Amino acid sequence: PTDERSLGAENYDGEGLATRRNDLIVSGSLNTFLHNSYTARRLGVISTGSAVRGVRSRPGVGMHAMQILPGDKTREELIRNVQNGIFVRGVNGLHSGVNPVSGDFSVGAYGHRIVEGSLGEPFREATIASTVQRMLLDIVEVGGDFEFLPGGTGMSSLVIAEIALSGS
């Protein structure tokens, strides 16, 4: 949350506590939960500096400048290792296609097919669906092409073993 390269970087959370790095997943296992003062007090732990709030709302729990740390391979190397798949260049409908309680998502996607390790024909108006939990479990590899996205989160290319696909 304090990475100055991110538009989402903040020194203090929505309750005025210092933000800090929280490693949520380490070596494929859940490492910690995020907390504001209220949730921390309820569970008898220390706040992780993760309070977020709107102008008229009470502080909730959320992330500031979330990042998936980069791996070693280039995007091209990741694609070369996929025999049959899709390369998603972008998604539509994140604001309405994700259930924040269950983790279910179904969003529009566009990109290219991957055939025998090379980018093939483009596709658009496809739908990808899964759960956030399943997608995290199905990550095979993380690319070294880290970049910040609008809103302050940071991301690298991911190779995901399975995801439901429908459409063109």
List the model feature ranges, each with a label.
Residues 1-168:
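N-terminal small-residue-enriched
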